Amino acid sequence: MLWKKSFPFSLGDSMKWVNHRIITTSIAFLLTQNIPFVLGAYAGSTLPDRLEAHKERSSLTYYNHRQVTHWFIPYMIAFIFLAILGFVINPFSEVSSLFFKVTLGGLFGCIAHIAEDAVTGTVPGLTLHSRIGKAFFKTGDNKEYAVSAICIVLTIITLIIIGISYPLQ
């Protein structure tokens, strides 16, 4: 099945890319207040869709959307492995720590993307052959933009509060 992305932000029945970026980045910031992690999350927020790009045609053409690149299990395994490696087993040097935080954020961004797609349709479940998710709203619907707006407002409020109490990490 061929899916075409309506440039520059939507992809078939998935959430629009701009909203993936806003929601994922806001959640990452609200959870961590860690800039390298947040930058990684921003980059990872559209990665599952980008990995499906058909290389021979264009970066806007996709085959079999929401299949293997939207399976959350590999991302979760890598995220948990890196988190245990980095925080419990072997704390990294300053440079390695920066790379680690960006990578961990990127994996978080991929996981968030998949969770966000699960509210506008289905994604692979525990196996590639099972599907989970429910379409609570359609792509581009006012509800999608309302969720993004709420994330922006919460992030601004958090920035104001933490800006007074302590600097960002």
Q: PLM features: residue spans?
A:
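N-terminal membrane-targeting hydrophobic helices
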Residues: M1-Q169
